[in-house]
Amino acid sequence: MITHPLASFARLLPAVLLLSGCQLESFSERQARQRQQFMGEAASSQKPLLWISRRSPTADGAISSLMAAHLYGGQASISGELTPPTQAILQRCQQSAPEPAAELTGSAIGLVGVHEGSDLDPRVQASQVVAIVDHHASSSGSLALEQPRRIDLRPWGATATILEQQAQRLGVVLPKPLACAALGAIVNQTQGLQPASTTSQDRQSAARLARRAGIQQAQLLTTFELEAR
């Protein structure tokens, strides 16, 4: 029997790593390391971490909670009902939905796709917020945080674009269902990548996600339902 040389190397790889002092990082360990890099001291909190968007969020907000939880650990949560387009995207991509936020007290909160207090679940307190990722510009209604937190606001078309770019920087390959859903979020939020609401970063992220999800550019508008504006 002829053995492929790569097969022999694959069997020897664990021993090579052990002898060289290298250790393979588990998925949860990688999430913890990335959370520490992103949040700093706030990552050391022993409270459970929930990623949540505005009440009854858009597809971008709901799916961004899934992306943030995948990158940094914690639970993707939702306050209110998923919109029909969001449900359609998740079903099309075979991606599970965020969990309903039954209890927020005692949790650390990461906000995605929102940073104004008036848009939040009233149970969310400013003292709970440890991070904000949003594509909306800062305004007079922005949540007043009691202490320094990680805030990533970029004037792009979608929050999912920001998180996809973070995944690129971290070297994280999103699972195919999540990549598909993230693509749907960007297409949905930008109304089909319309020039008026789409940046070059949105197009770059959409192209990468489409390749990962196996969706052709010409299929985008027929694949994902758009939110009514």
Where are these regions (language model features)?
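Extreme N-termini of proteins with methionine-enriched Sec-type signal peptides or N-terminal signal-anchor
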Residues: 1-2, 39
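Bacterial N-terminal signal peptides that target proteins for export
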Residues: 2-10
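Generic low-complexity segments that are intrinsically disordered, proline-rich and/or Lys/Arg-biased
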Residues: 5-6, 15, 37
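Bacterial N-terminal signal peptides
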Residues: 11-20
